[in-house]
């Protein structure tokens, strides 16, 4: 995996990755690959070597105004990054908590199961950090309403994430 720097994460320049993720024709396919790589420990090691990668993926996710495949892959990728504390801190700093809570508050009825599962897993993982809990405290009412909204889902992953968030 490290033998070929396919996405330029090991180089000082961000040009290659930035161009790939911002290319309207390629960005979905690039995000599918990144999402797959983020599923593996070595893949996360490789991808997170590029400090600006999380910023670019978050911006790509925010640009998408619908629950598209691209936004889903961005969300899934950053959720997988939150298995580590440094990306958790970065995502909290980028205000992803407010973004995902507002997304759920405004679009809950139209979101795919994928977005709901990965979004709630992201909320749970970010709530494990003290800084994350402080951000959630500022929007506690809205967060609780969202968690309540999804409690009737017949999906064990969703219920596990809700439970984990409430207990953190």
Task: Set out the residue ranges of the language-model regions.
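Amphipathic alpha-helical segments within extended alpha-helical solenoids and repeat-rich scaffolds
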Residues: 1-20, 54-64, 97-108, 144-155
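Alpha-helical solenoid repeats of the armadillo/HEAT superfamily
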Residues: 21-35, 65-83, 93, 99, ...
